[in-house]
Amino acid sequence: MADKYQEILRTYWGYPDFRGIQRDIIESIARGEDTLGLMPTGGGKSITFQVPALTQKGVCIVVTPLIALMKDQVQHLKARNILAEAIYTGLSRQEILRILENCIFGEIKFLYVSPERLSSELFQTKLRHIPVSFITVDEAHCISQWGYDFRPSYLEIAKIRDMKPGVPVLALTATATPDVVEDIQNQLHFKKQNVFKMSFARKNLAYVVRTTNDKLTEMVHILQCTQGSAIIYARSRKRTKEMAELLNKQGISATFYHAGLDSDVKDIRQKNWQNDEIRVMVATNAFGMGIDKSDVRMVIHIDCPDSLEAYFQEAGRGGRDGEKAYAVLLYNQSDENKLMKRIDETFPDKEFIKDVYEHLAYFFQVAVGSGMGQTFMFEIEKFCFTYKYFPTRVDSALRILERSGYIHYEDNPDGKARIRFNISRNDLYLLENVSEKEESVITGLLRNYGGLFTDYVYIDESLIERVSELNRQQVYMILKNLSARHIIDFIPRRKTPYISYTRPREDGFRVIIPEEVWEVRKKQFTAHIKSIISYAKNDSICRSRQLLSYFGEKTKMKDDCGICDVCIDHKIPQKQTIISEILDLLKDGKPHDITELNQLKYDSEDMASVLEEMVAENMFYVEGDKIVHDP
């Protein structure tokens, strides 16, 4: 007989039962215990907080840095008739106030919040009156300074706990070393240690490192010899475009994705890839978080990530359906040189950081003692041209200044426009002095979007252009005019990065960069760089075991995955024997039924692996259910 958790799972998600440690985590947080769940990518983290929250009174607050994931999960919850909202950088004060009031007086079950919003006075004032069931911390490794993706804003969560002392916390992450596991619990003020961990082993995912000086040719070769959806990760935005163009010329359908693209373009490309209209997504690390696509057969890293944590998380997007998939790292000596150079690029000297802070004030014309709370649009190219800086070093300096508490730097703001009608539908029909063009825009909005009279709705201005037969500038000015007349509330899209001062501006020489922000993190970053280099160069230990060991799982030789490049190479003597026997069977050049291979008494997985390689090397070809060797 199903219990209440299983009933909710079946009713809202249609799954018959829980997987792995999902139930353990659910029951732990439902008992009011602070809980840390370690689950690999695709392990079903969201179920562990969404299910128990529906059995409790009050709002489940979900802290996550991933705006795209927030929007996606809120959309999915609303589609299941579960009330959910999200607050993140870029919303107007009016929008935030409406959401918080609904949490106090309405029936909202989930409130997704970006960590930056936790410190705002408005949020903290309203939070005191919100009935909270429990707090979920997604990407919990971000709170640890030992982690590869530390975010200072996550430290605000501990202060929120002080405001809600009886409310338990559920922390979730897909990547955490033993040190990070310990630190997460300390930083979140766990009453006692309480960790549930799934093995990070992915038995269907073959980790491969290919050493090559011609990565592009190798990449094309791999994709030509395999089938199915693929992701290729590259470090630079320019490189993603170039590689997508190269693949298309080779007859492999591909597109590219990075944080600098218009949000509408990103949405379209992501949707086309998810619907298999495009086979290959070439992307920076801006792509992948919260992407719900289980049948990715190939993940290729053409550039080395900065850490094994980042590599493991990105590689883990392959084979989430449990079917065979590959994670391939293309590597050569220049990668090691580039990675070691990244250390100084990521941690420029402190005097340079102070100079950047001083020049920001000149650039924005902010006097000493002023600026707190002010936000400025920031064009990094213009800033670098003005002061003769390299953008990479400036970007690093700004992130260190942010971690040191001087500024908030948002280099990838949400780019979609939003509107809400301020008058009722009946009053709208009674409006006078509405021009023909204004009427066409209003009609376009009403026909293509729902909920405009009750909530802020994201709109696609290019769609309104098409249906109203106006250009973008005309649509924009009409929306601005309707907003000025209080018919609608129009929030234009904002694509330009911005910087906010989080404290009054100081003289540059007074800026203090804390040891834990520079010295400690540089040491950690260096260790992360060395770990990925070591992984790429170690061709004697099973790839899966190397990764599991890094994340604190004890393994033995019997735990070798059997499918990574290291394990396959260890089987070479047997592999050569299998190849010889297959070729001997096919030596007459005639078509043979594929079932004839069953007479060769070898392990089925070993046979499958050898056959894949033989096809890739054109040693035989397949015609229906026949195989032919052309001597």
Predicted regions, residues:
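Helicase motor core with emphasis on the C-terminal RecA-like subdomain
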Residues: 1-12, 16-20, 24-46, 52-61, ...
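Amphipathic alpha-helical interaction elements
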Residues: 14, 224, 599-602, 612
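C-terminal accessory/connector segments of nucleic-acid motor ATPases
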Residues: 349-504, 510-610, 617-630
